[in-house]
């Protein structure tokens, strides 16, 4: 009986930890979305459209962000921290290198970007 009780206790605790981690992931995604959309923070939306939406205006110079869930987190981090490491002529500012976004803020933006699954190739008619 003691073994079953221990197993049930461990299972219950593991379940609580998993729910807690999902909640914190959800909070991180929300924080990243706020940074992405807020002009006094990351303001990514000034240059990047997401999920197949298009931007119309002077700041719509960045590529449309889509299917980012398949990108490695390290690659996304590098693009945000200092895009010039992979593209020396990038117009995107180095948000991390310049100190505009902290490490935690960049990770939050990445958590949000990883929720972007839209692919124009998957939706052609």
What kind of region is each of these model predictions?
Residues 37, 70, 81-85, 111-118:
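Sec-exported extracytoplasmic/periplasmic mature domains
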Residues 1-11:
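Bacterial N-terminal signal peptides that target proteins for export
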Residues 19-39, 124-125:
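Electrostatic cytochrome c docking/interface patches
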Residues 37, 49-81, 91-97:
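Gly/Gly-Pro-rich "capping" loops immediately C-terminal to redox-active cysteine motifs
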Residues 32, 41-51, 109:
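The canonical Cys-X-X-Cys-His
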Residues 97-125:
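C-terminal capping alpha-helices of c-type cytochrome domains
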Residues 10-18:
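Bacterial N-terminal signal peptides
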């Amino acid at each position: 009986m003691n073994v079953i009780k221990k197993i049930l206790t461990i299972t219950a605790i593991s379940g609580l930890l998993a729910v807690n981690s999902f909640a914190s992931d959800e909070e991180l995604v929300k924080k990243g979305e706020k940074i992405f959309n807020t002009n006094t923070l990351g303001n990514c939306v000034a240059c990047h459209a997401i999920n197949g939406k298009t931007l119309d205006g002077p700041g719509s110079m960045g590529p449309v962000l889509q299917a980012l869930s398949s990108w490695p987190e390290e690659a996304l981090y590098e693009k945000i921290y200092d895009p010039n490491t992979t593209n020396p002529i990038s117009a995107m500012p180095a948000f991390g290198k310049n100190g505009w976004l902290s490490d935690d803020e960049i990770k939050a933006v990445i958590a949000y970007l990883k929720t972007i699954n839209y692919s124009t190739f998957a939706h052609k008619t």
